[in-house]
């Protein structure tokens, strides 16, 4: 299986939410922050043949980046990463799912009111800001993405203006 650039970008974005991940059989990927206050779900074009866990998603993505055109072959206990016409290969072992933070239930999201794209860099920046100021909440309001503590009106916050269509 080859991973599309869109799927690689989804995984990069998810790595900013949580460094570990369980990918279930199928084409839906979801993650949850360690504090369990951020949940993300994406449907990708690939269909994963089996469920597997990755302990360090950034490391996994770095291993994939060692190949120009990686081919992933999902085995029982590891994924074999190769490249056609190359002598390179990597055996990347799956993690024990019990040590990985993952949503325990299927995420059922309400119908969307607003949709927008957010870059990996922007998500990384806002997540870093939340960590720096200790903000547990992320709020999208009036085209701005803000991290803050909604329970504390005098809490520090950090805001990024986004290009979000007005409804």
Where are these regions (language model features)?
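Acidic/charged, solvent-exposed loop-and-adjacent secondary-structure segments enriched in E/D, K/R, S/T
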Residues: 100-102
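DNA polymerase processivity clamps
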Residues: 1-94, 109-167
């Amino acid at each position: 299986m080859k991973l599309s650039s869109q799927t690689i970008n989804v995984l990069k974005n998810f790595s900013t939410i949580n460094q570990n991940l369980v990918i279930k059989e199928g084409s839906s990927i979801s993650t949850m922050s360690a504090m369990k206050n951020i949940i993300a779900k994406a449907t990708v074009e690939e269909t994963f043949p089996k469920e597997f866990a990755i302990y360090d998603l950034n490391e996994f993505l770095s291993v994939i980046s060692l190949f120009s055109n990686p081919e992933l072959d999902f085995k029982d206990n590891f994924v074999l990463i190769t490249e056609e016409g190359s002598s390179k290969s990597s055996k990347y072992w799956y993690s024990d799912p019990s040590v990985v933070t993952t949503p325990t239930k299927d995420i059922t999201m309400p119908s969307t009111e607003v949709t927008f794209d957010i870059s990996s860099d922007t998500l990384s920046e806002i997540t870093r800001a939340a960590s720096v100021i200790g903000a547990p909440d992320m709020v999208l309001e009036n085209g701005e993405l803000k991290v803050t503590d909604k329970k504390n009106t005098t809490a520090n916050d950090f805001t990024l203006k986004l290009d979000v269509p007005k409804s």
